[in-house]
Curated annotation (Swiss-Prot):
Protein name listed in UniProt: Polymerase basic protein 2
Lineage: Viruses, Riboviria, Orthornavirae, Negarnaviricota, Polyploviricotina
Record's subcellular location: Virion; Host nucleus; Host mitochondrion
Primary location recorded for the protein, binned into one broad class: virion
A molecular function GO annotation: RNA-directed RNA polymerase activity
Gene name of this polypeptide: PB2
Keywords assigned by UniProt, alphabetized: Cap snatching, Eukaryotic host gene expression shutoff by virus, Eukaryotic host transcription shutoff by virus, Host gene expression shutoff by virus, Host mitochondrion, Host nucleus, Host-virus interaction, Inhibition of host innate immune response by virus, Inhibition of host MAVS by virus, Inhibition of host RLR pathway by virus, Inhibition of host RNA polymerase II by virus, mRNA capping, mRNA processing, Viral immunoevasion, Viral transcription, Virion
A GO BP annotation: DNA-templated transcription
Annotated motif Nuclear localization signal, positions: 736-739
Entry function: Plays an essential role in transcription initiation and cap-stealing mechanism, in which cellular capped pre-mRNAs are used to generate primers for viral transcription. Recognizes and binds the 7-methylguanosine-containing cap of the target pre-RNA which is subsequently cleaved after 10-13 nucleotides by the viral protein PA. Plays a role in the initiation of the viral genome replication and modulates the activity of the ribonucleoprotein (RNP) complex.
GO cellular component, one term: host cell nucleus
UniProt source species: Influenza A virus (strain A/USA:Phila/1935 H1N1)
Family: Belongs to the influenza viruses PB2 family.
């Protein structure tokens, strides 16, 4: 009331009215700027002059009971005067110091849990090592990077549901927690945050940091994983860089890295199978990365890499609309073209059918180590501005751009025949043929391209055919720039289609990706990748194939057993036996198969000769196309551990060891599982099966010629005698029976007789 009276009093004086009405507009605008709205216009200044006051803080009245009026030095901590316009107390900054030193202690147990991402960052920085600072020109390009180390990969909506469920469990509103990761995180966080006193809003903010990937489009030269991005301001400036090794890894970077490795392995493997697309999907669905299903990761993870994008396309997910060629990501920034097929002649007079793009187009090209801007017309490179880490990287980019331009002088620079094939031994398409050719040797290409004098343009220099820089001359249309070309920033995703051979096309039919574009770089995954699909057994080498094949038979023994007796051909054709074939020496594969199939047929024909362990042991050998021959084997060779190792047809070996007592099978010393049913111990072995319809007369008798194979016995006439090879290389004399009636008793007596004959 007092103030209003005072103001009225002021207004009644003519000078006041004059100042307020005649002040020029610009002053008025400034007054308005600083006095309108709730938003503080100059926070730093405001803070300075507030802190210069004695009591800049207001607090609830209850504070007077919790804090003494004066501290130990006798300084006043709060004022007895009330804050104007509210019933709060005016407090000195010294009160905050007093509170921090002498105030009540609360439990700190929840802090590391809530502020987990901060605590972890401190640890990483504590254990990180900073190296020397180098002053040099920094070629930075803007890339979309993950700025938030240590997060799960939930979508914003999924994270929102989890946060609501954890922080405000009683709040109304439909929340559906569906994915495995959502449920796990919710359960874990609810347990961690029991009796937590930190404000729910703060908890919600911190949870968001932990659950959602945050990306920014930042200029980077060097590492792009999130543990490098968090120290970007410390490691690279405009003209300097500081070496840094992170003091720890975070799961999200590991997931990204392992996902790329898994996807590359899967695409490479699928490309060589009979139906690449079906195989790829089967492998993606049967693979786990760090214990999480690969398909779940693909749905959530925004990593853009050729193999990863092929897997996403196969699953019907949207991917970036840029396309890949020669390991560079191309994005058309202007122009357009129409496609037509044209036949061209190489320098070796080989005819190539290429799809020519007619029209003027501009592209950005972004690779791991070089970037470029390309302007081209129909079969003509107009301008290429490249920047890269080193000579090698710049050369790679130039080769890719020259091939992409489809210029005649490039095609004429081909020496020799083009016959590059992919992993499945299929010829590559003409554009990739040309690319592979010049990646091997680009000397002729660069020499034939032509050179031109250049103008002096800031930040740009010329490059000669031998890749040396020059300020006078350059290869036609090609310049090297100090500035990098930014990655394509948009995160928009396009609907794409994929064909059986894993070629990904946009809706206008342009090929964006194909298996040829998948990098051959091998890396070691940070997280365990578990491939359940048999196609990926060979990824970890021969031993893994061996163990996995036998594990598969044991796991599926009930169905395998039925197929073995009723429909063996179908069983032999199962894809699970495919990888095993690569372990069997090629020259003898067919003979092993014929031998084992004959053996199995005899087991089927004769009651009581079924031997589970032996069937399991020999089954993978029967999968190869059989060759019928006279050969008998007492052991079969497999190539593992760099040499041939033997699997004994009868009995155990280091490769295949079945313990009858424990019913456990070990393959190369690794546990391959337990047999649920006991092989019938009492039955005679293979010999009795082999020798039905024959009478065993005794030991080998040389007068009756060389030992015959089991197959050849069927050619004997009734009553004819012959030596026969049985079991593990033992030979006995037999006679073909004159009557068929006694065949059944043979199998029982054969065993006893063989033992006598041998011993």
């Amino acid at each position: 009331m007092e103030r209003i009276k005072e103001l009225r009093n002021l207004m009644s004086q003519s000078r006041t009215r004059e100042i307020l009405t005649k002040t020029t507009v610009d002053h008025m605008a400034i007054i308005k700027k600083y006095t309108s709205g709730r938003q503080e216009k100059n926070p730093a200044l405001r803070m300075k002059w507030m802190m210069a006051m004695k009591y800049p803080i207001t607090a609830d009245k209850r504070i007077t009971e919790m804090i003494p009026e004066r501290n130990e030095q006798g300084q006043t901590l709060w004022s007895k005067m009330n804050d104007a316009g509210s019933d709060r107390v005016m407090v000195s900054p010294l009160a905050v110091t007093w509170w921090n030193r002498n105030g009540p202690m609360t439990s700190t147990v929840h802090y590391p849990k809530i502020y987990k991402t901060y605590f972890e960052k401190v640890e990483r920085l504590k254990h990180g090592t900073f190296g020397p600072v180098h002053f040099r020109n920094q070629v930075k390009i803007r890339r979309r990077v993950d700025i938030n180390p240590g997060h799960a990969d939930l979508s914003a909506k999924e994270a929102q549901d989890v946060i609501m469920e954890v922080v405000f469990p009683n709040e109304v509103g439909a929340r559906i927690l569906t994915s495995e990761s959502q449920l796990t995180i919710t359960k874990e966080k609810k347990e961690e945050l029991q009796d937590c006193k930190i404000s729910p809003l703060m908890v919600a903010y911190m949870l968001e940091r932990e659950l959602v990937r945050k990306t920014r489009f930042l200029p980077v030269a060097g590492g792009t994983s999130s543990v490098y991005i968090e120290v970007l301001h410390l490691t690279q400036g405009t003209c300097w860089e500081q070496m840094y090794t992170p003091g720890g890894e975070v799961r999200n970077d590991d997931v990204d890295q392992s996902l790329i490795i898994a996807a590359r392995n899967i695409v490479r493997r699928a490309a060589v199978s009979a139906d690449p697309l079906a195989s790829l999907l089967e492998m993606c669905h049967g693979t786990q990365i760090g214990g999480i299903r690969m398909v779940d990761i693909l749905r959530q993870n925004p990593t853009e890499e050729q193999a990863v994008d092929i897997c996403k396309a196969a699953m019907g997910l949207r991917i970036s609309s840029s396309f890949s060629f020669g390991g560079f990501t191309f994005k058309r920034t202007s122009g357009s073209s129409v496609k037509r097929e044209e036949e061209v002649l190489t320098g070796n007079l080989q005819t190539l059918k290429i799809i020519v793009h007619e029209g003027y187009e501009e592209f950005t090209m972004v690779g791991r180590r070089a970037t470029a801007i390309l302007r081209k017309a129909t079969r003509r490179l107009i301008q290429l501005i490249v920047s890269g880490r080193d000579e090698q990287s710049i050369a790679e980019a130039i080769i890719v751009a020259m091939v992409f331009s489809q210029e005649d002088c490039m095609i004429k620079a081909v020496r020799g025949d083009l016959n590059f094939v992919n992993r499945a031994n299929q010829r590559l398409n003409p554009m990739h043929q040309l690319l592979r050719h010049f990646q091997k040797d680009a000397k002729v290409l660069f020499q034939n391209w032509g050179i031109e004098p250049i103008d002096n343009v800031m930040g740009m220099i010329g490059i000669l055919p031998d890749m040396t820089p020059s300020i006078e001359m350059s290869m036609r249309g090609v310049r090297v720039s100090k500035m990098g070309v930014d990655e394509y920033s948009s995160t928009e995703r396009a609907v794409v289609s994929i064909d059986r051979f894993l070629r990904v096309r946009d809706q206008r039919g342009n090929v964006l990706l194909s298996p040829e574009e998948v990098s051959e770089t091998q890396g070691t995954e940070k997280l365990t990748i578990t491939y359940s699909s048999s196609m990926m057994w060979e990824i970890n080498g021969p031993e893994s194939v061996l163990v996995n094949t036998y594990q598969w038979i044991i796991r599926n023994w009930e169905t395998v057993k039925i197929q073995w007796s009723q429909n063996p051909t179908m069983l032999y054709n199962k894809m699970e036996f495919e990888p095993f074939q690569s372990l069997v020496p090629k020259a003898i594969r067919g003979q092993y198969s014929g031998f084992v199939r004959t053996l199995f047929q005899q087991m089927r024909d004769v009651l009581g000769t079924f031997d589970t362990a032996q069937i399991i042991k020999l089954l993978p050998f029967a999968a190869a196309p059989p060759k019928l021959s006279r050969m008998q084997f007492s052991s079969l060779t497999v190539n593992v551990r760099g040499s041939g190792m033997r699997i004994l047809v009868r009995g155990n070996s280091p490769v295949f060891n079945y313990n009858k007592a424990t019913k456990r099978l070990t393959v190369l010393g690794k546990d391959a599982g337990t047999l649920t049913e006991d092989p019938d111990e009492g039955t005679a072995g293979v010999e009795s099966a082999v020798l039905r319809g024959f009478l065993i007369l005794g030991k080998e008798d040389r007068r009756y010629g060389p030992a015959l194979s089991i197959n050849e016995l069927s050619n004997l006439a009734k009553g004819e005698k012959a030596n026969v090879l049985i079991g593990q290389g033992d030979v006995v004399l037999v006679m073909k029976r004159k009557r068929d009636s006694s065949i059944l008793t043979d199998s029982q007596t054969a065993t006893k007789r063989i033992r006598m004959a041998i011993n």
